């Protein structure tokens, strides 16, 4: 009952209520793998929402009006070094680890953890996670796409281009727009 309601709360972006119900579901059943996965997803969404809200609040709109738009940069954005933010990321990573312990062949946990690691600029970890997702499901186009972007970010155009090409072959249309 808690899990289903948590899904409903997540769909309407009531993240705190979703987390409350997921915590209850996990307390009811410590081995509820899907609840751990969804809790990690909800926490990651909550972090994303919090960062975007803080980013918007930190923009000096007078400065934006006075500058040419191509010269504008979001220099006042919250840093990933924030201690409470680091703790939030750690909680998400712990939930993903719990899912991997109980369901090591669940590809989306590697994919999502790769996305999280990429947002933390842990590119080596992100590549490892995308690679594992691809190993488990060789036709996972989105994992090829994201891994290709990370390779490009690191300056490895050969591997990046190969992954983006493969992603395109697998139906990820965005891979052709880079």
Located regions from the model:
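Alpha-helical tetratricopeptide repeat
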Residues: 1-178
């Amino acid at each position: 009952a808690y899990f289903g309601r948590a899904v409903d709360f997540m769909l309407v972006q009531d993240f705190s209520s979703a987390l409350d119900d997921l915590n209850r579901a996990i307390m009811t059943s410590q081995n509820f793998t899907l609840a751990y996965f969804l809790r990690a997803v909800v926490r990651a969404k909550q972090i994303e929402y919090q960062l975007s809200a803080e980013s918007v609040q930190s923009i000096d709109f007078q400065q934006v009006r006075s500058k040419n738009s191509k010269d504008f940069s979001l220099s006042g954005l919250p840093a990933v070094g924030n201690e409470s933010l680091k703790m939030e990321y750690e909680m998400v990573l712990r939930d993903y680890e719990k899912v991997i312990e109980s369901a090591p062949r669940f590809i989306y946990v590697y994919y999502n953890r790769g996305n999280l690691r990429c947002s933390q600029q842990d590119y080596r970890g992100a590549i490892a996670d995308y690679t594992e997702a691809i190993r488990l499901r060789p036709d996972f186009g989105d994992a090829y796409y994201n891994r290709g972007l990370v390779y490009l970010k690191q300056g490895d155009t050969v591997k990046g281009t190969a992954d983006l090409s493969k992603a395109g072959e697998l139906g990820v249309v965005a891979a052709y727009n880079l």
